[in-house]
């Protein structure tokens, strides 16, 4: 009986139907970009100072320039460690009193300004920006600055929680239904975020968007890889992730054109509604239909693929079946990932690598956005490096292998982070170059580890292994905003030190993994244990006691 791959070899592994469907689904990948990294613009924190009643009137009466107003009324100017004082403290002075002159008005109150009492901001802040962000609208600065971190962490928390439930929905009710449902919720929650009346409701809508957006991306990823033949699956998977990079590049331009965070959020959310047209444009996965014993529907879709590709369907198409062993199946458990020495080692290393690449990727972007410069151009330049990163993967993955390029990329990200510590502020171009090098390294690792993770586990625990290890990616995303912004308050280079240590450790630990280039996917525990060495004699094979499907109810 022919399998889906057998039929695709005859009707086209990547014909007109697959190309059209791929382009449709790439919109889902691009839409994830502003959800994942839109915080750079939505949560942009401009320079700010306390609003003091009477200062505007005095400045207008005296005809001060903006520089003179700052010099006369804001504490902490010129001090190397005066950022907090300048942005979060104010002189406890009544600026409405008539005795204040126009030239150094505070001189009449104290011979030295350092003797004047300071107090926290009580009347809001003045922001030096023509646009708006969630920071300027909800005053998320000083004591409330951590709320910006929480805003971003909620997205990653949603990714973490949603990927578990959405995966079940996709397997139980179908890829297409899961894609449409998550897309609808994603679009609605994005619009609700844009019109949220307060910080709390905005946070809840953002969490809801995180719960479904990554699941929507994963559903699109699964659909397109199940529509193409095995020879194109890896390339299509990488190019699907390139669409995410296209979304990042577009985001920098849209954010520049729309400096108001509410209109920006609305603009990047509305295109998601277009994906609802997938109901008519994208069919269900024939592989999933076969797994649900809906063979007639699967045959109709394969026949449609043949027609769209201009090919004749095979004569035995009606006998289409899944290419899988229908005999006894093993039921994996979490303990199986740690039960044997090599599986245990691989699991711990992969979990650390997923965590590290998430911290480096997101952390370098957030750090660059928080350290001055033109945030739009900096984000644009660093997004462009993701395209050569994809090219490097396509060129090296079957020529050089997986492990050495991945280790080198981790090391490059770590070294670039360490060098950034010593770059003077006036060499901003060098800061951008090093940030781009680090981001390129993290991008390569983030895309390659998906493949390596699957290739190191035996068949019956492969999906579980990928799910458990990749969950650390979302855990890294949850803590990264706090790691970047709060550590910068302690000492600005401190996040870069953490990034450097993580990158160097990850580079070394990657070399402890076996190379999987040209190696068949392990089917058994013994295969996974012996990836580095020749098979042992039969009597020394490792067996695991696992449950079988017979032990479960119908």
From Swiss-Prot:
Residues 43-149, 198-206, 259-262, 369-374, 424-431, 486-492 are extracellular. PROSITE patterns: MFS, SUGAR_TRANSPORT_1. This is Solute carrier family 22 member 1. Residues 1-21, 171-176, 230-237, 284-347, 396-402, 453-464, 514-554 are cytoplasmic. SUPFAM superfamilies: MFS general substrate transporter (SSF103473). Keywords: Cell membrane, Glycoprotein, Ion transport, Membrane, Phosphoprotein, Transmembrane, Transmembrane helix, Transport. The keyword Ion transport applies. The gene is SLC22A1.
């Amino acid at each position: 009986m022919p399998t889906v791959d057998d039929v695709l070899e005859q009707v086209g592994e990547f014909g007109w139907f697959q190309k059209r469907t791929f382009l449709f689904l790439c919109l889902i990948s691009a839409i994830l970009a502003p959800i994942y990294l839109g915080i750079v613009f939505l949560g942009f924190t401009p320079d700010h100072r306390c609003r003091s009643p009477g200062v505007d009137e005095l400045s207008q009466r005296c005809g001060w320039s903006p520089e003179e107003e700052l010099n006369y009324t804001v504490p902490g100017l010129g001090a190397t460690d005066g950022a907090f004082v300048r942005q979060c403290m104010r002189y406890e002075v009544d600026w409405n009193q008539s005795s204040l002159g126009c030239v150094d008005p505070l001189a009449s109150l104290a011979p030295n300004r350092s003797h004047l009492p300071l107090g926290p901001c009580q009347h809001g802040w003045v922001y030096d920006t023509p646009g708006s962000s969630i920071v300027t609208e909800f005053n998320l600065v000083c004591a409330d600055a951590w709320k910006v971190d929480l805003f971003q962490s909620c997205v990653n928390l949603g990714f973490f929680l949603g990927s578990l439930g959405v995966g079940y929905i996709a397997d139980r009710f179908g890829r297409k239904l899961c894609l449409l449902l998550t897309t609808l919720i994603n679009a609605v929650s994005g619009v609700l975020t844009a019109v949220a009346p307060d910080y709390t409701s905005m946070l809840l809508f953002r969490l809801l968007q995180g719960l479904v957006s990554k699941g929507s991306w994963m559903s699109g990823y699964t659909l397109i890889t199940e529509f193409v033949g095995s020879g194109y699956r890896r390339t299509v998977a990488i190019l699907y992730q390139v669409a995410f990079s296209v979304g990042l590049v577009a985001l920098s331009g849209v954010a520049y054109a729309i400096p108001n965070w509410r209109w920006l959020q609305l603009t990047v959310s509305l295109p998601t509604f277009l994906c609802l047209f997938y109901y008519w444009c994208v069919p269900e996965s024939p592989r999933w239909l076969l797994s649900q014993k809906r063979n007639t529907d699967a045959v109709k879709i394969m026949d449609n693929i043949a027609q769209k590709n201009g090919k004749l369907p095979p004569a035995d198409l009606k006998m289409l079946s899944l290419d899988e062993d229908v005999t006894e199946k093993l039921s994996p458990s979490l303990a199986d990932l740690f039960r044997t020495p090599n599986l245990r080692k691989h699991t711990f290393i992969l979990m650390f690598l997923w965590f590290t690449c998430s911290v480096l990727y997101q952390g370098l972007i957030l750090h660059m956005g928080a350290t001055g410069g033109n945030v739009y151009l900096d984000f644009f330049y660093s997004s462009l490096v993701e395209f050569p990163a994809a090219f490097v993967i396509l060129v090296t993955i079957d020529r050089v292998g997986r492990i050495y390029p991945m280790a080198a990329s981790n090391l490059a990200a770590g070294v670039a982070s360490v060098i950034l510590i010593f770059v003077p502020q006036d060499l901003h171009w060098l800061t951008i170059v090093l940030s781009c090098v680090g981001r390129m390294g993290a991008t390569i690792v983030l895309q390659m580890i998906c493949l390596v993770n699957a290739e190191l586990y035996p068949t019956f625990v492969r999906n579980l292994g990928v799910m458990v290890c990749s969950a650390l990616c979302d855990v890294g995303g949850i803590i990264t905003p706090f790691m970047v912004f709060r550590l910068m308050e302690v000492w600005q280079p401190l996040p870069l030190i953490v990034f450097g240590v993580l990158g160097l450790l990850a580079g070394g630990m990657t070399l402890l993994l076996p190379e999987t280039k040209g190696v068949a996917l392990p089917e058994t525990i013994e295969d996974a244990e012996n990836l580095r060495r020749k098979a042992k004699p039969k009597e020394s094979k490792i067996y695991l006691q696992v449950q079988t499907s017979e032990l479960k109810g119908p």
